Amino acid sequence: MKYIFVTGGVVSSLGKGVASASLGALLRARGYKVTAVKIDPYINIDAGTMRPYEHGEVFVTASGAETDLDIGNYERFLDLDIPAGSNITTGQVYQEVIRKERAGDYLSQTVQVIPHVTDEIKRRIRVAGETAGAEIVLIEVGGTVGDIESLPFLEAIRQFKFDEGDENVLFLHLTLVPYLGTSNEFKTKPTQHSVATLRSVGISPDIVMVRSKTKLPPEITRKIALFTSVRENRVFSSYDVGHVYEVPLALEEQGLGKVVEDLLGLERTMPNLGVWTNAVRTIKQPTREVTIAIAGKYTEMPDAYLSLMESLTHAGIANDARVNIRWVNAEELTESGEGGLATQLGNADGILVPGGFGIRGIEGKIKAAEYARTRGVPYLGICLGMQIAVIEYARHVAGLEGANSAEFDEYAPHKVIDLMPEQLEVGGKGGTMRLGDWPMDLRGGTTIAELYGVPQGGTVKERHRHRYEVNPAYTEQLQDAGLTISGVTPGVAGRGAGLVESVEIAGHPFFVALQAHPEFKSRPMRPSPPFAGFVKAALRGQSSDEQGTEATTASV
């Protein structure tokens, strides 16, 4: 097995995840079995309880792990499901070391960072690769070289090269070369210091990748090679591009794939990058455009909805369209009248309400769902967005005045959304939700079944992350009022009826909402069916509007 470790220097948020995923895509395009591991030096066990404003979205894997958003990048770029155990945190490592100490596994030993913590880190990396059946394992070390939190991990990967041999381990270091407009020059000193810091802990990079605004000129590449003792053909420029899906193509053009094959003693192969070329062409030169309004809670931090944004991009590729996102702060909709709603949501070709937690902005999201329902605007609800759609329908169509979710009002007269029975005895917050892949039985003859390619009905799987569900006590009343329950998970313990997985409104141009998070399974070459159908409906709505305008003009 071969191992590629990716570290970062100078500043955080340089894009190590995208760089690692892009390299993985180049290796996958050459036919290698690749998997990815993300190391996060924080003491949290996982990302599940962290603030979206600070950490971005929590990406949920098929196995139910709540992980760093970079795992989502790996799944999208590599077009595979990353197995459990591929997001390693300091909290996980120390928890296991302490468990072993208490169990007596280290009897007579003084438990220390070296070798016990570093051995546990190495064990987890190897297990992740073996579990995936990989030939090449990409390991991104989070944080910045020089941070105190990263030191045990850097020591572990230093040992890795000693353990596995030079031909099986490669170190890639990502740094920043800022451009100073006042002096009209690139500054390489931060990169020089970053590599020196990495060398001070015993790691010499085999490849240096440089983030910069534009592609580095040859003289700057030569200077970096000279001062970092890395050959010039191993210094790569990761410059700003229009879309992240251009990064693999830009790196391949510079020869990254060939250099990695040479360093790891692999036979050179020709990559098949046609799917990436076609995807980028569609992104940059679409035949149509569509605007989607996202009524959310974390609109100031788009990374909180990263997979959702990428899913819309994938849906755009499938429909040969550019998807423009209009961010709408749901709190601002709360007090909005008709004029305010029209300003925020008017001219949007579709409205999407994403997942989330907490009461802030809830009434604004309900108004967004009502706006879409009553005006025939395509609507897609994700997780909380489905619960919002049910609350709105219960209040304004089913006649259940005061309907709400128990999450927001435990004294509501009609708790149409309630805590799942199996959650009643749950005390802790971390890792205790309904997580990962769950089956959805789709009803034949519904929009959702058509989208998933099972028009007569069938079972599909999507990822979930929730504690609350549509209250089974109200499903009959909601259906009598015209709401279609198009998908359920049957046989859930503690209830007579199945858990509601999707709802829709018959006769509406497109009103579909799911309890699941289909964005987590969307890929550039395999878009999520609900997202692809949503964008298609939004484009269809544009055509209808244009035809209506033409008819009106003709009649005048």
Curated annotation (Swiss-Prot):
Q: Which residues bind L-glutamine?
A: Y53, G356, L384, G385, M386, Q387, E407, R467
Region Amidoligase domain: start and end of each range?
1-266
Lineage, top-rank taxon, reads Bacteria
Q: Where does ATP bind?
A: S13, L14, G15, K16, G17, V18, D70
> What residues bind Mg(2+), as annotated?
D70, E140
Catalysed conversion reaction: UTP + L-glutamine + ATP + H2O = CTP + L-glutamate + ADP + phosphate + 2 H(+); L-glutamine + H2O = L-glutamate + NH4(+); UTP + NH4(+) + ATP = CTP + ADP + phosphate + 2 H(+)
Q: Which InterPro entries match?
A: Class_I_gatase-like (IPR029062), CTP_synthase (IPR004468), CTP_synthase_N (IPR017456), GATASE (IPR017926), GATase1_CTP_Synthase (IPR033828), P-loop_NTPase (IPR027417)
Q: Which GO terms describe its molecular function?
A: ATP binding; CTP synthase activity; glutaminase activity; identical protein binding; metal ion binding
Give the active-site positions: C383 (nucleophile), H517, E519
Arranged from A to Z, the UniProt key words for this protein are:
ATP-binding, Glutamine amidotransferase, Ligase, Magnesium, Metal-binding, Nucleotide-binding, Pyrimidine biosynthesis
Entry GO terms, CC: cytosol
Which residues are involved in binding CTP?
S12, D147, I148, E149, K187, T188, K189, P190, T191, Q192, K223
What is this protein for, i.e. what is its function? Catalyzes the ATP-dependent amination of UTP to CTP with either L-glutamine or ammonia as the source of nitrogen. Regulates intracellular CTP levels through interactions with the four ribonucleotide triphosphates.
More details: CTPSs have evolved a hybrid strategy for distinguishing between UTP and CTP. The overlapping regions of the product feedback inhibitory and substrate sites recognize a common feature in both compounds, the triphosphate moiety. To differentiate isosteric substrate and product pyrimidine rings, an additional pocket far from the expected kinase/ligase catalytic site, specifically recognizes the cytosine and ribose portions of the product inhibitor.
Q: What protein am I looking at?
A: CTP synthase
Q: Which organism is it from?
A: Deinococcus deserti (strain DSM 17065 / CIP 109153 / LMG 22923 / VCD115)
